[in-house]
Each structure stands twice: as C-alpha cells, then as structure tokens.
C-alpha cells in the first residue's frame, strides 16, 4: 500500500451513466479540493451546492459538496465528497482535474478501507464483513455480512478470551496449591467450565462452515441420462 499521508481520490459509485456519481477524497489536502473547481469547502459536517468550473472557467456541473474532518470521518482523515450528476463526461473531467492538480493521487484498490482499518475505524473482521456485504447477492448473504459487521463474531471471541484468562488463573492456582487438601469439586468444576468453552467455540466453528457455504455458494452436480429433461 502506498503512502498513508497522501491525499487520495476515487469514484465511489459504479462507473457509467447514472443519476448521481460520488467522488470521494481523503487525506490532509482533501479540504482544498473544492477550490480546484472554483468552489468553497463547506464547514466540517456540512454540505452545500456548488457550481464546479473547469480549468478554463467554464461550468462543469452543479454538485453537492460535503466535508468531514478527521478523526470524525469514515477514514479517520479529512474527507470531501463531491456528488455530481452521473455523466461519464463530468466524472471523467473531475477525476482528471484532481489528478492533474498535484497533491492528489488516485486511490489504489481497497485503499479507503485500508485507511479505515489503520485509523481504528474498523477491525479486521469488519473489513472482511464489509467486503462480503458489498459482494452479497442474496438476502441471506447480506444478513450474514451485516451480522458480522455488527459484531456477531467479535463479541463471542472477546468473551472466549476473557473466559480463557479466568480459567488460566484458576488452573495456576490449582497447580500452586496442589499439595493442599482441596475438594475434588474444584478440579471437576474447572474441567466442566473448560469443556463448556470448547463446546462454545466448536459451535461457532460449525456455524462458520455453514457461513462459508452461504458466502461462496454450493457446487451442485446434475446427473442423469442424456436429454432426460
């Protein structure tokens, strides 16, 4: 991944003809981007309608400009979004002017998400869930991705870690006081609690295998006589 201190930009909506196109800019120089088009940058957390001008001063489009200040933004950096009409000519001109201006560069694939992760806006499980949500094609895939994005796996993992620490402390105490006359129930309870933790982890792993099938689909072979229907 290239420099984290660069100001990057990219088309955040699918390319092609559409009603609206969103150009996202993130980095230390993001709030200077609207000035390239003869527009003022709104205050952080605000938006305004602005007429964008090209390098010759001719109108390019009328757009909605939003500004967010780091760390209170999606990437944790200063962010500007320019919402233009979804004309391929307009978006190409805006991207070209940003690239030619100096101080801005096109983002590489996944770089906005990488900055979200690097700045603590999302964890590793969240980045995987976000990718799954974007790629989802069915309601079940969407719901599974959203559950993971909402912490469905993070929460039990955190609980397992806390339980392991507690069990480790109890096991150390049992070893340290092995020569004491401890009741058998102490060791039995530790064993039961450890087995309960193992069953909890195994249950989530089993669900994970089902989740892989939901995410990737299932390969099915249809077998039968030729021209059977």
Regions of interest found by a model, annotated:
Residues 121-200, 204:
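Long, non-coiled-coil amphipathic alpha-helical linker/lever segments
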Residues 105-108, 163, 209:
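Hydrophobic alpha-helical segments, principally membrane-spanning helices and signal/leader peptides
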Residues 1-143, 147, 151:
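A glycine-rich (often HGG/GG-containing) alpha/beta subdomain
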Residues 6, 17, 21-26, 36-40, ...:
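Conserved G1/Walker A P-loop phosphate-binding module
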Residues 97, 152-160, 220, 224-226:
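Short secondary-structure transition/capping segments
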């Amino acid at each position: 991944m290239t420099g984290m201190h660069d100001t990057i930009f990219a088309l955040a909506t699918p390319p092609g003809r559409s009603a609206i196109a969103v150009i996202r800019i993130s980095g230390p120089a993001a709030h200077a981007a609207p000035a390239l088009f003869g527009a003022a940058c709104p205050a952080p957390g605000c938006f305004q309608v602005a007429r964008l001008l090209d390098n010759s001063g001719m109108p390019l489009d009328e757009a909605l400009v939003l500004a967010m200040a780091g760390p209170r933004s999606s990437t944790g950096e200063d962010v500007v979004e320019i919402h233009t009409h979804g004309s391929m000519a307009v978006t190409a001109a805006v991207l070209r002017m940003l690239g030619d201006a100096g101080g801005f560069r096109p983002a590489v694939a996944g770089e906005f998400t990488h900055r979200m992760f690097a700045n603590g806006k999302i964890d590793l499980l969240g980045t995987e869930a976000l990718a799954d949500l974007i790629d989802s094609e069915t309601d079940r895939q969407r719901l599974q991705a959203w559950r993971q994005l909402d912490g469905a796996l993070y929460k039990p993992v955190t609980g397992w870690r806390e339980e392991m620490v507690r069990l480790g402390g109890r096991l150390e105490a049992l070893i340290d006081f092995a020569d004491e006359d401890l009741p058998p129930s102490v060791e039995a309870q530790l064993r039961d609690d450890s087995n309960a933790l193992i069953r909890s982890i195994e249950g989530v792993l089993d669900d994970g295998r089902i989740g892989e099938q939901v995410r990737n689909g299932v390969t099915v072979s249809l077998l039968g006589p030729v021209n059977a229907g």
